[in-house]
């Protein structure tokens, strides 16, 4: 969810809506359109696969909980999209299934991993493996890495 927050709104840069969107908003309603175009921020489409409780519990009950992320990649993912899989071991079954599904659908796979990169490394177009073995240390190193990725994306697109 944290990464989605950095991508869907301004992280360090102001991201005003386009003139086209501003005009369309003001056409629909001049007063609200002005307020919306002033306060809304241009985002990069991002979805956290961890935030859909209804789908997750239904899929866990009816099918297999370890495939919940893969199911979402199957439903949401389009060729050319990017799947960012985060796993401290590189072997998290739910992230591994999602990475395989992403590759099958033509998504680019970035693995943010620890230890030796595990099995997910083999399905990643780009594997970022932080040099630690202990879970808490891997998690601490993942934070500046994904912040750097968000900063680079924001700089590139805005």
Where do the protein language model's features map onto the residues?
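Glycine-rich phosphate-binding loops that contact phosphosugars or nucleotide phosphates
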Residues: 1-158
């Amino acid at each position: 969810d944290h990464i989605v927050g950095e991508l869907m709104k301004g992280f360090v840069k102001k991201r005003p809506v386009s003139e086209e969107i501003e005009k369309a908003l003001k056409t629909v309603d001049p007063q609200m359109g002005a307020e919306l175009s002033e306060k809304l921020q241009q985002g990069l489409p991002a979805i956290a696969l961890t935030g859909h409780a209804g789908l997750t519990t239904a899929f866990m009950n009816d099918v297999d909980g370890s495939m919940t992320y893969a199911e979402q990649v199957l439903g949401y993912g389009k060729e050319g999209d990017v799947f960012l899989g985060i796993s401290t071991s590189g072997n998290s079954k739910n992230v591994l299934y999602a990475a395989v599904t992403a590759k099958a659908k033509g998504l680019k796979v970035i693995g943010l991993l620890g230890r030796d990169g595990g099995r997910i490394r083999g399905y990643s177009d780009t594997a970022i493996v932080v040099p630690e073995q202990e879970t808490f240390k891997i998690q601490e190193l993942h934070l500046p890495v994904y912040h750097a990725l968000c900063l680079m994306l924001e700089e590139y697109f805005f």
